[in-house]
Amino acid sequence: MPYFNVRHSNALVVTNFKVMFSSFKKTANFDKIKRYKAHLLIKHSRPQVHFTVRDPYQKALSLYKDKFQKIPQNADLTKPFKWEKPQRVFFPAMGLSTKHNSNLDIQQALINTSFDEFVQLLAKCYWKDEHIQPQHWILHHPNYLLLKNLGIPAERLSVYKMDQADDMEAFAEATGFDFSNRANSTGKIKTPEKISPESLQTINHIYQQDFVDFDYKMRVT
């Protein structure tokens, strides 16, 4: 879960998958905790909560490059292999099944999916996995039966855009985050040169509230 207690400090870090989660796991003074522990700390210890967010277009691109390109391209199918949940949630819309399709079939289907096709699939399943859900859901999750709301008062919530250098410098100063641990797992995977207007419209619709809440500009072209 993407919640971290900042050691030796009355502070928490909250993020989403594909928003520096891997980097935070490598940070020595960040201790990963579960949602219920974060909720208890917020309620009883009144920490400052540092929340990192990402441009929704870049987050979608990063997930596509990781789950639909990097992982299948590097999968060793000569050994037992299990596809990750943020891949499997797409399978029904792709007509795939781990019971009826071979890993090779699935590998090729993922790799051969264009980014625009990925976005159309995303619209059919984005609520099914935390990697692809709207970022603001982590603060107040509509699908959780328990602990829907983390209960963070506005005055104790600091929001940082990971794509803004000034924001991340402020985040590092506030939390002790070491930039040398920053991971870029998909840096070598080619980024699609252009996002179609149809895909932009779909991303705008899915993540509309993220654009509003975190002051990201929507694109139409």
Predicted regions and their residues:
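PAPS-dependent sulfotransferase catalytic core
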Residues: M1-P56, S62-L63, K70
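Short, surface-exposed loop and linker segments with low hydrophobicity and enrichment for Pro/Ser/Thr
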Residues: Y3-S9, G151-A154, S196
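Aromatic-acidic/polar surface patches that form glycan- and anion
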Residues: V6, V13-F17, F21, Y160-Q164, ...
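Amphipathic alpha-helical segments that form well-ordered structural scaffolds
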Residues: S23, T27, D166-A174, T202, ...
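Short aromatic/hydrophobic-glycine micro-motifs
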Residues: F30-I33, F177, Y216
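PAPS-dependent sulfotransferase catalytic domain
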Residues: R35-F51, Q58-T191
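Aromatic side chains
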Residues: H50, Y57, Y64, Y207, ...
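Charged phosphate-binding loop/patch that engages nucleotide di/tri-phosphates or the phosphate backbone
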Residues: R156, F179-T221
